[in-house]
């Protein structure tokens, strides 16, 4: 396919009769697909309540030491990186629907292995399986939803991917208060099982069916989702061709590729994992009686502001929310760094984060007051992240790539995201030893500044455009 082929940019699926579709089943199909991200969020949140329980476990139950606990949390990201590659292969060969059905299997199998675990290796194996499923779901669900949605609601439905992730995390936190780790793993089997059931009754995306020359099935899917088959075009010439490196010379390919990979990298370099790492300790410093409340507070803020983002996404647009989100994160990470500078800035202090003890020169009341600065900065950061840099990179990833490279390109984006998440999580402590905690957060603030500049100069607005119009923009048409 070359940029000179006009058929590539013709709309596959336009609004029926020139007006917005009125089909409601598209919301049901999006909900069914979004149960994958809900399962993904539950798997991410599972480690927070499960690790303390597993560290206290008495024989014959498996027990985690500090090293095993670290891997129990981190191995999911490695599995997800592999899942991103697998998902990129599956989504173009098996289709979007079948890929979602298949990813429910390692979700259920992984949680089942954890439930039956008799040793640490079974626990890690179960987490690796759920991580693999997370990687597939994080790629396929946004692609499926973006391809079934009409432009007027694509931002809303696409943002629901991240909304369901944070709902899943919050669900794991709340359930962890009343369920021990085995029963919590049993609960983790419910969302993917429900997804498997519902997706059996949902259609494949019309765009994928068109590229496979399955016209009648595409028309039936369109009627099911949108309530109409009007506004339909033949599949673009070349949309079924496979990816090869020579395509990277085309602006319609390399421009969205650079944007997609950069967005995923900036998301992880924003400092979000560092803020989450410190949440409970900061709440302890602010004299909260139950520091585990921090996880729930963080989860509630994420859900509320991701929901706000979903509601305003198709009005405010992607670029504006990314810029506002980045600016909020710049100020909040800078304030975080100032907190650490004030409490640990003395030359005699360890550079390795023991923030649970205030600096001796600080009175207790002053220490508590500074801790409230950190609590406010943390809540502001989480709200800012949830409004923009949480959901939008995943949404844009599903929008900006042409059909014939979508599987490979989104797979590389997901691989980038999960590898960056693993590296940032595992190496953050080492970074703080070199730069001190305040330096690490100020570095995150600098990355947030770069993310704002990158958005302003490189990221186009996709609000209200068809996927084919977005492709035409990158090709300079």
From Swiss-Prot:
One of its GO terms (cellular component) is membrane. It is found in: Cell membrane; Cytoplasmic vesicle membrane. Residues 47-70, 118-127, 178-182, 278-292, 341-367, 426-438 are extracellular. Glycans are attached at residue 349. Insulin-regulated facilitative hexose transporter that mediates the transport of glucose and fructose. Facilitates hepatic influx of dietary trehalose, which in turn inhibits glucose and fructose influx triggering a starvation signal and hepatic autophagy through activation of AMPK and ULK1. Also able to mediate the transport of dehydroascorbate. Interacts with AP2B1. This is Solute carrier family 2, facilitated glucose transporter member 8. It comes from Homo sapiens. The gene is SLC2A8.
